[in-house]
Amino acid sequence: CGKGRVELFMTYQTRCHAIGIEYDDRIFATACENKKSGISGERTTFLLENAENYQVPIEVDRVFFFNPFSIEILRKVIAAVTASCYENPRELLLFFYYPQNEYISYLMTVDELMFVDEIDCRDLFDGENSRERIVIFEVSI
């Protein structure tokens, strides 16, 4: 979740509920402070835990990743996400902002994931960084 800004923005813009997972207690404390001043803080939950241990709740149907962690941890997180969909089938979309090529290569090999779209975000920033994009996958069980 980092400082929680994406979660707070999304809950404000879309009226959704958001859960942010952060493992660093200092960054988590900053997210909690941001939540106090956020207009949509009541629809935002921040948890201090390791993402690879997180049990995905049944109501989760969108997951946002911002270049979050190592490929080894990503594998565990994707396993938990797909297991949640096997237990409780539903539409579930995964959004990867600023993904590493290693992430995309791995995600393309996961049988339960289907590539949906790619949003080019290079126009939002100076330069031509090819990682400035959002790649979307759907869990397909």
What are these regions (language model features)?
Residues 11-12:
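Gly/Ala-rich phosphate-binding loop of Rossmann-like dinucleotide-binding domains
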Residues 17-22:
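Conserved SAM-binding motif I beta-strand of class I
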Residues 29-58:
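S-adenosyl-L-methionine
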